[in-house]
UniProtKB/Swiss-Prot annotation:
Identification of the protein by name: Zinc transporter ttm-1
Signal peptide: none
NCBIfam families named among the record's database cross-references: CDF
Recorded name of the encoding gene: ttm-1
Organism: Caenorhabditis elegans
UniProt entry tagged with the keyword Ion transport: yes
Any one annotated GO CC term: cytoplasmic vesicle membrane
Length: 410
């Protein structure tokens, strides 16, 4: 990481004149910059394989000089030495957990595919819309499992020149596709259900419906057990130095999401089983299209929340569990920080957040300390994965600028 405080007069359009920028720096800042640069060069090649490096550069902004640093790593500790060993251990453990999660999801996807085929056949044979609706819902979940597997694999792919953030939003686009397919299937089944209610002339094979629904309950229980026990129990990660975090359930986020899907399918299969019992013992065939309506409403409510999350991710909205005023207050409390503006928090993917901020400093002498403190605060207290901290001399005009502060009052 390299920090430089650059005066406006030192900025030039041509890159060959950038060497004049250091002449306007205080001596202590120049010395600190040189020492940090040399320490960066000492990072071992072994460590680089498991570490994204921060970098810094200066540029002009509204007539005053400033610098900023990017932090894309997953650990605040240096990769070299003892901290590097812990950091490498954390990444290896995360990789192994991802591999286990991928195998479990493939197993559940295979079970789902087998049962979906059986359920569509059984639903067609029994002339049951409720079973067809359940099969459609499970098809959506199968797509979700495949998307989760795709997301795990994409997470291992490196970023490219075109995709500088990597493939973090592949999961978001996949989820959007899954929801659209589910809505189309549900709409078709609702139209058929309306026709059956209006005409009230349809037969349902209650025995086939009962058997299919019973098998559906059994399949969902088996898939739930596979997801629950397939990835192991207690998991943990070690940070550099003295930090030690635990994830007691030891489950990948995609596996937890898949487990929620399966629980929803189990509830729906139980509902189909109840409808089959009603038809079997009372002969009231309207229970089938009515059950279809109820499941369609459930599908709508569950997918609307997913679509809302997708919308906010694509719009780069601040995640709902963050309060920008709390973040600003915490940064303002740092020693030497006179102002905080251009504060942004947004989602790169479903579970990865990025952050950027401008810090106006009382004195440039603590620039490096302020950057380090801000990065540590944001990553440890707020759990942000990608942080960009930009520092600049305090200017009352900038601090009171409505444009710079508009996100605070919006």
């Amino acid at each position: 990481m390299t920090i430089s405080m650059i005066s406006p007069s030192s900025i030039r359009l041509s890159s060959d004149k950038r060497d004049s920028s250091s002449s306007n720096l205080p001596a202590n800042i120049e010395e600190d910059t040189q020492s940090v640069s040399s320490s960066d060069s000492g990072v071992s090649a072994d460590s680089i394989d498991h570490h994204h490096h921060g970098h810094g550069h200066g540029h002009s902004h509204g007539g005053h000089g400033h610098s900023h640093t990017h932090n894309n790593d997953d650990s605040s500790s240096d990769c070299s030495g003892a901290g590097g060993g812990a950091h490498k251990h954390s990444h290896d453990e995360k990789y192994q957990k991802g591999r286990r999660a991928e195998k479990v999801l493939w197993a559940v996807a295979a079970l789902s595919a087998v049962f979906i085929a059986a359920e569509f056949v059984g639903g067609f044979w029994a002339q049951s819309l409720a079973i067809m609706t359940d099969a459609g819902h499970m098809l959506s979940d199968l797509l979700s499992f495949i998307i989760s597997i795709f997301a795990i694999r994409c997470a291992r792919l490196p970023a490219s020149k075109r995709l500088s953030f990597g493939y973090e939003r592949a999961e978001v686009l996949g989820a959007l596709t899954s929801v659209i397919i589910l809505w189309v299937l549900t709409t078709v089944l609702v139209v058929v259900a309306i026709q059956r209610i209006v005409n009230n002339e349809h037969e349902v094979d209650a025995d086939v419906m009962l058997i299919t629904a019973g098998v559906g309950v059994l399949f969902n229980i088996v898939m739930g057990l596979v997801l629950h026990f397939g990835t192991g129990g207690h998991g943990h990660t070690h940070g550099g130095h003295s930090s030690h975090g635990h994830a007691h359930d030891g489950k990948n986020v995609n596996v937890r999401a898949a487990l929620i899907h399966v629980i929803g399918d189990l509830v729906q299969s139980i509902g189909v089983l109840i409808a089959a019992l009603i038809i079997r013992f009372t002969g009231w065939t309207l229970a089938d299209p009515i059950c279809t309506f109820l499941f369609s409403i459930i599908v709508l409510f569950t997918t609307v929340t997913v679509m809302r999350d997708i919308f906010f991710v694509l719009m780069e909205a601040t995640p709902s569990h963050y309060d920008l005023s709390d973040v600003k207050k915490a940064l303002s409390a740092l020693e030497g920080v006179k102002g905080v503006h251009d504060l942004h928090l947004w989602s790169i993917g479903m579970d990865k957040t990025a952050f950027s901020v401008h810090l106006a400093l009382e004195s440039p002498n603590r620039a490096m300390e302020n950057v380090a403190e801000a990065r540590s605060l944001i990553r440890r207290r707020f759990g942000v994965a990608v942080a960009t901290v930009q520092v600049e001399p305090f200017d009352e005009k900038i601090d009171s600028c409505d444009t710079c502060q508009q996100q605070e009052t919006a």
